[in-house]
């Protein structure tokens, strides 16, 4: 009785070791079994043959497409064991079947494919049961199907008939699909058994659970079917097979395989499938698909059934993607979480190979995520994903650079610059990286000292190529030009303007065919009021790029500086025919129309701008009259559309480039406006600020036109619309001061100008109007102080010089007053309708 119990325990242990592929333990267990049960000699031969074959394959792994091994001493020994077990015929039928399947596997390893197929035919592989069998037998059957598929692929077809070729291909794929399905079932079963054993184990510690390995045959069964589908041009079935594998309940052994398959399917969905040819995972595949090779016809559904299948994920609340990008994104986010979980980060030499594989796998996932999220404009999410990739990014330029670009696209400029610094360290010879950093610094960040350093780096790196050196000088010129605009001392402004001019001249000489170099040289000359020279260079820029909006705009402003207002307006109209939604051009058009065609046309343009603004940002009621309150109630700013529209990036309508003072002022305005809005319970602004700033500017331009024709009521209504958006904007407060002046209420006007200057202390127009009121009140010293400060801020404002002359004259300083009047006359003669600085200075 004790012997029977011992035998039963041994048999259970042997079955467990076979299921868990612990082949090194089998010989010792067989010895114990033979000593206790003499009748098990044939079983011992089977077990020894199987364990020695598996040990050989572990030591000499097979590779797809490798040549056959032929007879080897170890394999000869395997054959002896299996032949002995089969020849005596004492085994039960199921063990005889196992012996035959293992013998067929041995024949494949030795290259005897025909004999292997003969054995499968004799055994009746398709009739072997899958229910009520131990897990190891599922593995044996799965490997048998995979081996049969491999043998069929290796053997040539006797006839050249195309139908036979198609039938053979389908037989091969069916073998692999069955192998894969049964392999998944086996892996689920063995994991269930292992977990059950762990839970039922007594407190006494036992052997640690053995990590399963797929091995060559199971891996082939799981991966070969979809490869053949794609090779044969049947993308529909290939995608279907991927989905079947991914829907199966995951096991520890299939985790890496699932990550690979998820990544491959995502790549196919992104690169090889459009929205029209997509079908979701719960739908039946289309009978005919443009994805498939039209010359190869076949069913897009399974041609076989199995008596038992692997468990799949199911339930009421499972998410099902509805389009290809959505499914790809889901797959990639799953892959990313798996890549992060299994990351190999150790820097010790022994782990180098594993670390490189881990990095390569993660990099592919993040590259595909960049494609998927980039298509949808989800740069915020992309930057968050790539931030998680930083654990892999030590000394890896590609991931750092991708992260920097995603931060740029997401509008996180400050962080992007810091990441770009690391990219420069990793790749110091690449001039494009400091050029990008300079672009960010001179943009919304307005870090001009940093921008100057990056621009000088570009110049130094670009010594080998004149193209990058020219770009470096262009960036340097823009930095100096912006610094000159910021400078509070007139002498410093002139020094920086000269440096900017020299840098632009150097850029133009290095790259005479670059329209940007010619354009910015012309713009800098215009800012310095060298109008004839500027005209020459802007014409060069237009010869190089005839449809450049900024060059056309500059030409129009230069013509207006020469008082050719009609010609300037014609140029603006020409530019607007190419760029009808460019608001900066439209603002200039309003000013020019006021000067040469009268206020009616200018007001029509303002109305037209409101209509464009509505159409750009999806008004739900396009027939709306355009009143500001109703605009606020019904406007929806679509983030995707904002990137395709030209919007002014400024808070002051007189300047298109960002200034240090205007950056600070706009932040103060925004904070105060939010407080004021909350107190007034006005409608909240949806989406980014730029569209709302543009809308406010439209209303302010309309108000300015009404002030010009002496209509304070209409001007007040327009200003109120802007105030609904930004109650504490210095431009709104300035316009209220203008309206108060028009009504003759000087004390009120003075209060508005003082409030505007409290928010933006360098707003020249408010300074000039406040000084004029102080002059009228007889406060000459304070008026002079304010006007001298205004001259320091903007030395080309002729109205300020004229006001300063009047104040000095009133104080009896006629000589200084005369000099101021002459300066004002000289500047007015070259003054454009709109300041040249309205044109953005960006890379």
Swiss-Prot record:
InterPro entries: Endocytosis_PI4K-reg_protein, TPR-like_helical_dom_sf, TPR_rpt, TTC7_N
Keyword ATP-binding: no
Protein location: Cytoplasm, Cytosol; Cell membrane
SMART domains linked: TPR
Alphabetized UniProt keyword annotations: Cell membrane, Cytoplasm, Membrane, Phosphoprotein, Repeat, TPR repeat
GO annotation (BP), single: protein localization to plasma membrane
A Pfam family per the record: ANAPC3
TPR repeats: 97-131, 219-252, 363-396, 397-430, 479-514, 516-548, 549-582, 696-729, 730-763, 765-797, 798-831
Phosphoserine modification, residue list: 160, 202, 625, 629-630, 673, 677-678, 681
Any Gene Ontology CC annotation: cytosol
Subcellular location, principal: cytoplasm
SUPFAM superfamilies: TPR-like
Function (record text): Component of a complex required to localize phosphatidylinositol 4-kinase (PI4K) to the plasma membrane. The complex acts as a regulator of phosphatidylinositol 4-phosphate (PtdIns(4)P) synthesis. In the complex, plays a central role in bridging PI4KA to EFR3B and HYCC1, via direct interactions.
Oligomer status and interactors: Component of a phosphatidylinositol 4-kinase (PI4K) complex, composed of PI4KA, EFR3 (EFR3A or EFR3B), TTC7 (TTC7A or TTC7B) and HYCC (HYCC1 or HYCC2). Interacts with PI4KA, interaction is direct. Interacts with EFR3 (EFR3A or EFR3B), interaction is direct. Interacts with HYCC (HYCC1 or HYCC2), interaction is direct. Association with the PI4K complex is strongly reduced by TMEM150A.
Protein name, as recorded: Tetratricopeptide repeat protein 7B
The organism's taxonomic lineage, starting at the top: Eukaryota, Metazoa, Chordata, Craniata, Vertebrata
